[in-house]
Each structure stands twice: as structure tokens, then as C-alpha cells.
Amino acid sequence: MIPGNRMLMVVLLCQVLLGGATHASLIPETGKKKVAEIQGHAGGRRSGQSHELLRDFEATLLQMFGLRRRPQPSKSAVIPDYMRDLYRLQSGEEEEEEQIQGIGLEYPERPASRANTVRSFHHEEHLENIPGTSENSAFRFLFNLSIPENQVISTAELRDFREQVDQGPDWERGFHRINIYEVMKPPAEAVPGHLITRLLDTRLVHHNVTRWETFDVSPAVLRWTREKQPNYGLAIEVTHLHQTRTHQGQHVRISRSLPQGSGDWAQLRPLLVTFGHDGRGHALTRHRRAKRSPKHHPQRARKKNKNCRRHSLYVDFSDVGWNDWIVAPPGYQAFYCHGDCPFPLADHLNSTNHAIVQTLVNSVNSSIPKACCVPTELSAISMLYLDEYDKVVLKNYQEMVVEGCGCR
């Protein structure tokens, strides 16, 4: 049996989507009739038909979120700290900002200004040493990119963790160079001992700093996604300017060390991050806003006030069974609009001229309906979740929160 609170939550979500004319296209007229049927079943027996209707509406909501099916994340799925921190910055959680800045996270203003979706991909564990490179300091590693067809990638970044070098007589004044390449042909087709690559990005860094380094790999990812060229992976090369062979490549983390726990390594693995847009809504933009109201937030009763206004509606993703794949937020305050639009319409009811005329006509001819209480302003929320392929996604969803109501 499906819990009654889950069914009721789906009903409430559907009511929000059906609450205003701007959302009428999200659910067809036949769907509106089904809402009434579900409401009739919610307080009584749960028939097989009600379960079918629940599945239909869950599918509708998943489609609204741009998902073909409900994600079923594996227990081994890892949420990179970078994606959590990016979500906190995007959602404007100010109390976390100092901590985020402390680990050296830089918000990617330029990529995000053209994207409404951020995806992250860990590299496959198998690494190939590239023969013929100086001191065997170059490795090839692969990323399995699963990106929807409607997603247009604008920018891609490779993040590698670099540890401080504290060995050798010259470490305080030493530097090393990190080069990132795209592998143009598979090793089987290359001349023995020489891999065909092209340089994507390079950086000269000091030995005595521990931090993440970010490299622009957009040309390679755009070739793989837009031009549908084969993906033969990336190569990383580390060369030291003032250090012996003994210390070559020991501090740029591309593989797990033997004494290291799997949990620590999961957060230090190389991470490929793509910034894209699916043509829906607006781009991700960094902003600060007040935190959404908590789930149980008492409101003062407004006696004798039945006019159109905004009411509390907290959507808890655990109530609809989605908390296993939605990482953050655990829920959000969606609000809804409800109330009368009496004649004459007061200024605070945020009415249009047409609504004023319609209400005036209704006062003398009851066959003409009153103006309706509907959302007049809506805002977006950011969601961090695991998709159907266990990839971590940060996405901006438009028109999810009612900011204002009015008679229209």
C-alpha cells in the first residue's frame, strides 16, 4: 500500500500546478479530472485505480523535472563536496559561505551565467600510464559522460586535487607544471610510445600549497557532445622543475593510495564538471535570499480575512518518497494562493483592469464568474539530485515558489 500522506502530497503538488493560468499547460484537462478523482479516494479506500493515478501524476512531475524515469540511486553513489558547496552558494545559504571560502571554492560566475544545469562526473578507476613521457609522469583517464540530448554544454572544467610537497631540499622554492590534454586517438592506433594528444590547459603551481586546481577542458567536451566525436579520454602530465625523479607526480591525486580509506578517496577523485542549458527557464545565478520557512511554522490566524492571499504549503520530498535521490533541499515552501476576490477589489489584491471589470460585471450579473485568486509572481528553486545514471546534478527549476497572489 502506498502511504496516504504520499498520495495527499502529490495531490497538493498538482493543486499548486493547477492553481494559476500560467501553469495550465503543465497538466491537461483530463489530468484535472483525475485530480478530483484522487481527492475523492484520498480520504477513503485506496483502490487499484488510485494507485494508477498516483503513478500517472508522479510521471507528470518527473517529466516537469526533466527526468524520463524515477532515479534509483545505488548505495555506492557519492555526492562530491564541490557540488554540495556549489548548491549552498547558489541557494544563498550565507552562514555556510565562510566555510566554503575557507576550502578555496570559487564560484564559476562565467560558466554559470550561461547555464541552468551543472553535472559532475568521476573518472573511471582504471588508469593508463602513457609511455614515452618524461619520467612516465603522464596518465590517461576516462570519463563516461551521460548527458541528455536536449542539454547544450557551454563550459566544462576538470578539477584535480593537489597536495603539498614537503620533501626534498628545494621544495620551498620549487614549482611544477600540470598539463591537461585531450587524447585524439586510441592507443591502439597511435605510434608505439607516442599518444596523439592536444594541449587543453596548463598551469605552473608552487609545491607548498594544498588545494584543488581547475582546468578548462571545454574544447574536448564540446567535441564529444556537440560534434559527436569519439571520447578517448583526457591525459594529465606533471613535470617538476626543481625536484628529483623520486618525487615525480606523488602529490597530484589521480589514483587512490593504498592506506587511504574509500570515503576519503571518493572526495578527492578527479572531477569533470559540465555547465549546460536545456532550454528551460533561466540560467543559474548566484543570489542571496532568506531561507525558506521551516516545515512547521505557525502562522497567526487571520480572522475575518478571507480575501485572496498567499498560504503556506511546505513540500517535503520524503512525503512523496523522493528523499533517496534528491540530495538538497529536503523540502521547500511552495505556498499557494486562495481567497475571495470581492467587489470592489482593493488595491492590495494586485488586480488587473480586466479583473476589476469582471468583478464589477459579476456584481450585477452572477452568471459571470468572479475574478480568481492566482499566483502573480513566482520564483525558482535550486535542486541537487542524483539522476537516472547516478550522476550528481545541480539544476535551477523555474516557477516553483509563489511570491505573490492577486485577483485575475
Swiss-Prot record:
GO molecular function, a single term: chemoattractant activity
GO cellular component entries: extracellular space
Glycan attachment points: 144, 208, 350, 365
Keyword field: Chondrogenesis, Cleavage on pair of basic residues, Cytokine, Developmental protein, Differentiation, Disulfide bond, Extracellular matrix, Glycoprotein, Growth factor, Osteogenesis, Phosphoprotein, Secreted, Signal
Modified residues (Phosphoserine): 91
Stored Pfam families: TGF_beta, TGFb_propeptide
Secretion signal span: 1-19
Stretches the record annotates as Disordered: 284-307
Prodomain residues: 20-292
InterPro entries named among the record's database cross-references: BMP4_TGF_beta-like, Cystine-knot_cytokine, TGF-b_C, TGF-b_propeptide, TGF-beta-rel, TGFb_CS
Cross-referenced SMART domains: TGFB
Protein location: Secreted, Extracellular space, Extracellular matrix
SUPFAM superfamilies listed in its UniProt record: Cystine-knot cytokines
GO biological process, one term: BMP signaling pathway
Disulfide bonds: 308-373, 337-405, 341-407
Role, per record: Growth factor of the TGF-beta superfamily that plays essential roles in many developmental processes, including neurogenesis, vascular development, angiogenesis and osteogenesis. Acts in concert with PTHLH/PTHRP to stimulate ductal outgrowth during embryonic mammary development and to inhibit hair follicle induction. Initiates the canonical BMP signaling cascade by associating with type I receptor BMPR1A and type II receptor BMPR2. Once all three components are bound together in a complex at the cell surface, BMPR2 phosphorylates and activates BMPR1A.
UniProt xrefs under PANTHER family: BONE MORPHOGENETIC PROTEIN 4, TGF-BETA FAMILY
Subunit record text: Homodimer; disulfide-linked. Interacts with GREM2. Part of a complex consisting of TWSG1 and CHRD. Interacts with the serine proteases, HTRA1 and HTRA3; the interaction with either inhibits BMP4-mediated signaling. The HTRA protease activity is required for this inhibition. Interacts with SOSTDC1. Interacts with FBN1 (via N-terminal domain) and FBN2. Interacts with type I receptor BMPR1A. Interacts with type II receptor BMPR2. Interacts with FSTL1; this interaction inhibits the activation of the BMP4/Smad1/5/8 signaling pathway. Interacts with SCUBE3. Interacts with TGFBR3.
Entry similarity comment: Belongs to the TGF-beta family.
Name of the protein in question: Bone morphogenetic protein 4
